[in-house]
UniProtKB/Swiss-Prot annotation:
It is found in: Cytoplasm; Nucleus; Preautophagosomal structure. The active site is at C133, D307, H309. It catalyses: [protein]-C-terminal L-amino acid-glycyl-phosphatidylethanolamide + H2O = [protein]-C-terminal L-amino acid-glycine + a 1,2-diacyl-sn-glycero-3-phosphoethanolamine. SUPFAM superfamilies: Cysteine proteinases. PANTHER family: CYSTEINE PROTEASE, CYSTEINE PROTEASE ATG4. This is Probable cysteine protease atg4. Belongs to the peptidase C54 family. Cysteine protease that plays a key role in cytoplasm to vacuole transport (Cvt) and autophagy by mediating both proteolytic activation and delipidation of ATG8. Required for selective autophagic degradation of the nucleus (nucleophagy) as well as for mitophagy which contributes to regulate mitochondrial quantity and quality by eliminating the mitochondria to a basal level to fulfill cellular energy requirements and preventing excess ROS production. The protease activity is required for proteolytic activation of ATG8: cleaves the C-terminal amino acid of ATG8 to reveal a C-terminal glycine. One of its GO terms (cellular component) is cytosol. Its EC number is 3.4.22.-. The lineage of its organism: Eukaryota, Fungi, Dikarya, Ascomycota, Pezizomycotina. One of its GO terms (biological process) is protein targeting to membrane. The gene is atg4.
């Protein structure tokens, strides 16, 4: 076992043995943001004496315990929003994803994944544990973008159950589901140089989302990918967002970027946190050394995230029109908060924005211009910018290296 594997295993062991839920004590008077919605500190949290049905906490084993109110409690409205975000995690016992033979294909796998593929999953991968975290983070980003379109930004867990179940079925762990891990791996092998059992980086994940959305044939959502730069070209975006009749269609912007070498350079901190405050935000995938997460919120210098590194049984395949059970849908949600200081994040990430209409696009452009600190996004008018436009983009962030 190499030092990277040992270090990764050590971190996971520590997390399982000591995994306290964060308290609202780092920036208790600062606003909390969750995908563009602002929540103010709950001044009355410490006066509650009667627990409500949501006054619980989830531990790492998945069990739920009563959470005693305290002066460091989180605003209830924020927790309701957080637990309504769709949370994709590792799954096991799904139909096998065929292995690709060859020494060069297994060289980039971790030791644990190689051993599992040789001793357990000999006919193919029946779990993405140990290698699918970036795919799951990307699925989370896409699922929440679709949720905002189909269910609305104000939708909360438990409402419109049938529609949520139908949305989740798009991500079922079967070869036929439009956004399954099987489809991600298939396109990754065909077009991105990523093979079963290998980590995906932000760039490969973005390209898979773009391709699978197109293959799905659903006109609900278009996808614009920045091609490993921090630049967004207005002419290219409009070509994608407008249909043949010129009408604007909801479009997901995916920006793969790297904001530093080993950590995020401090000059980018404000720009990164601001991205989660935009009403167009659908979160950030990546951003954790050797372990991708899905970031959905921020408070002060900390970011809140959903962790895909929990393995659950794959849901059984459903016939068309058949719904998941409440218990099955509940595995896609958690009330368990996790946070990280921005200085501890990995600089390689995939940032997502959902542009619903022309007015949304104009608002997003204004917000990009108003961000404090060094910009993490540059908007240019044309794919082939002239000299003046290039001069305005000299202060660009580093291009994405698709290595986790």
């Amino acid at each position: 076992m190499n030092t990277v594997d040992i270090g990764r295993c050590s971190k996971r062991i520590v997390q399982y043995l000591w995994d306290p839920e964060p308290r609202n004590d780092e920036d208790p008077n600062s606003s909390i943001w969750c995908l563009g919605i602002e929540y103010h500190p709950d001044k009355d949290a410490n006066t509650r004496e009667t627990p409500d049905k949501n006054n619980t906490r989830e531990n790492v084993m998945g069990t739920t315990n009563y959470r005693k109110p305290s002066e460091h409690a989180w605003p209830e409205s924020f927790l309701l929003d957080f637990e309504s975000r769709i949370w994709m995690t590792y799954r096991s016992n799904f139909p096998p994803i065929p292995r690709v033979e060859g020494d060069d294909k297994s060289a980039s796998m971790t030791l644990g994944v190689r051993l599992r593929s040789q001793l357990v999953d000999t006919q193919g991968f029946t779990s993405d544990t140990g290698w699918g975290c970036m795919i799951r983070s990307g699925q989370s980003l896409l699922a929440n973008a679709l949720s905002m379109l189909v269910l609305g930004r104000d939708w909360r867990r438990g409402a419109r159950f049938e529609e949520e179940s139908q949305l989740l079925s798009l991500f079922a762990d079967t070869p036929t589901a439009p956004f399954s891990v099987h489809r991600f791996v298939k396109h990754g092998a065909e077009s991105c140089g990523k093979y079963p059992g290998e980590w995906f980086g932000p760039s490969a994940t973005a390209k898979c989302i773009e391709a699978l959305s197109s293959q799905c044939g659903n006109p609900t959502l278009k996808v614009y990918v920045s091609n490993d730069t921090s630049e967004v070209y207005q002419d290219k975006f409009m070509d994608i967002a407008r249909n043949t009749s010129g009408a604007f269609q909801p479009t997901l912007i995916l920006l793969g970027t790297r904001l530093g070498i080993d950590n995020i350079t401090p000059v980018y901190w404000d720009g990164l946190k601001a991205a989660l405050q935009f009403p167009q935000s659908v979160g950030i995938a990546g951003g954790r050394p050797s372990a991708s997460h899905y970031f959905v919120g921020a408070q002060g210098s900390h970011l809140f995230y959903l962790d895909p590194h929990y393995t659950r049984p794959a849901l059984p395949d459903r016939q068309e029109g058949e719904l998941y059970s409440k218990e099955e849908v509940d595995t896609y949600h958690t009330r368990r908060l996790r946070r990280i200081h921005v200085r501890d994040m990995d600089p390689s990430m995939l940032i997502g924005f959902l542009i619903r209409n022309q007015e949304d696009w104009a608002d997003w452009l204004k917000r990009i211009e108003a961000v404090k600190g060094r910009p993490i996004i540059h908007v240019l008018k044309q794919m082939n910018p002239d000299h003046d436009q290039e001069a305005g983009a000299l202060d660009q962030v580093e291009a994405l290296d698709d290595i986790e």
